[in-house]
C-alpha cells in the first residue's frame, strides 16, 4: 500500500536540504577530493530517487513538468557507477538540478496544504458500498445516494477475488455515490484499493436516480 504522497515529498525535501547543508561553502575541488562528502551526497541522491519511484503514477502525471524519470534514473546511474562515479555530473546535479527540484517540491507542498480541505465524490460498486467497511476505514458513513455510471462494466476478478470495473461502451454500473469525501479519506480509499498496484482512479460522471450529475472518482482494474 502506498503512503501519503506528502511522506515521500518530505523525504525528498529532507534529502535536498541535507545536500545543501553538506555542500554549503564547498567548492567543486572540495567535493572532488572528499570521499566523505561524495558518499553523503550520493546517498541523499539515492534517497531522492527512491522516494520519487514511490510517488503514485497519477501524482507524477499531474505534475509532469517535473523530470521525475530523470531524477529516479540518476539514482540508478550512481548506484551502477558507485566505484567510478561521474563526479562532474554529480556536482552539476547538486548545483543546478537539485535547487530546481526543491523549488518545485515546495510549490507542490504549498498547493497540497491549500487543497487539504477539498471534498470529492466517489462512485462505489463493491466493498465501499458497505457501511461496516466505511466505518472500518474512515470511522464514519458519508452521505450516500444511488447512482449510475455509463461506459463501464462490473466484473468479478478471480485473480484477486474482488469485484472490479473496466471501460465498456454501451454498458453501465449501478452503485452508490459517496459524497463529500475528504482528501485524507480519499487517500485511505486509495490505499484500500491498492492504487497503482491493482487499480487506477479515474474521474467520470455519475447520474443519480433523479437525473442529477455528479463528478466522481471510480476505481478501475488495471
Curated annotation (Swiss-Prot):
GO terms for cellular component: toxin-antitoxin complex. It comes from the Archaea. Gene3D superfamilies: Gamma-glutamyl cyclotransferase-like. The active site is at residue 75. The modification O-di-AMP-tyrosine is found at residue 82. A motif (RX(4)HXY motif) lies at residues 75-82. The keyword S-adenosyl-L-methionine does not apply. Keywords: Hydrolase, Nuclease, Nucleotide-binding, Phosphoprotein, Toxin-antitoxin system. Pfam families: GGACT, HepT-like. The keyword Repressor does not apply. One of its GO terms (molecular function) is RNA nuclease activity. InterPro entries: AIG2-like_dom (IPR009288), GGCT-like (IPR013024), GGCT-like_sf (IPR036568), HepT-like (IPR008201), HepT_RNase_toxin (IPR051813). Its EC number is 3.1.-.-. Modified by cognate antitoxin MJ0435; probably at least 2 successive AMPylation events occur on Tyr-82. Homodimer, probably forms a complex with cognate antitoxin MJ0435. In the N-terminal section; belongs to the HepT RNase toxin family. Probable toxic component of a putative type VII toxin-antitoxin (TA) system, probably an RNase. Probably neutralized by cognate antitoxin MJ0435. Neutralization may be due to AMPylation by MJ0435. This is Gamma-glutamylcyclotransferase and putative RNase MJ0434. It comes from Methanocaldococcus jannaschii (strain ATCC 43067 / DSM 2661 / JAL-1 / JCM 10045 / NBRC 100440) (Methanococcus jannaschii). The lineage of its organism: Archaea, Methanobacteriati, Methanobacteriota, Methanomada group, Methanococci.
Amino acid at each position: 500500500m502506498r503512503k501519503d504522497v506528502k511522506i515521500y515529498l518530505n523525504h525528498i525535501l529532507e534529502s535536498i536540504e541535507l545536500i545543501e547543508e553538506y555542500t554549503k561553502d564547498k567548492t567543486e575541488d572540495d567535493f572532488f577530493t572528499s570521499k566523505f562528502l561524495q558518499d553523503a551526497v550520493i546517498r541523499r541522491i539515492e534517497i531522492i530517487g527512491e522516494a520519487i519511484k514511490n510517488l503514485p503514477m497519477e501524482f507524477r502525471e499531474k505534475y509532469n513538468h517535473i523530470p521525475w524519470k530523470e531524477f529516479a534514473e540518476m539514482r540508478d546511474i550512481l548506484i551502477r557507477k558507485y566505484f567510478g562515479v561521474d563526479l562532474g555530473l554529480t556536482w552539476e546535479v547538486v548545483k543546478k538540478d537539485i535547487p530546481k527540484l526543491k523549488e518545485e517540491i515546495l510549490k507542490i507542498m504549498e498547493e497540497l496544504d491549500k487543497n487539504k480541505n477539498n471534498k470529492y465524490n466517489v462512485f462505489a460498486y463493491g466493498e465501499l458500498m458497505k457501511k461496516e467497511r466505511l466505518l472500518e476505514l474512515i470511522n464514519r458513513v458519508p452521505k450516500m445516494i444511488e447512482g449510475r455510471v455509463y461506459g463501464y462494466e462490473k466484473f468479478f476478478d478471480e485473480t484477486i477475488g474482488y469485484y472490479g470495473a473496466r471501460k465498456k461502451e454501451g454498458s453501465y454500473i449501478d452503485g452508490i455515490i459517496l459524497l463529500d469525501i475528504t482528501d485524507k479519506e480519499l487517500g485511505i480509499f486509495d490505499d484500500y484499493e491498492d492504487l497503482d498496484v491493482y487499480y487506477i482512479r479515474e474521474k467520470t460522471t455519475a447520474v443519480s436516480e433523479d437525473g442529477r450529475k455528479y463528478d466522481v472518482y471510480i476505481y478501475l482494474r488495471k
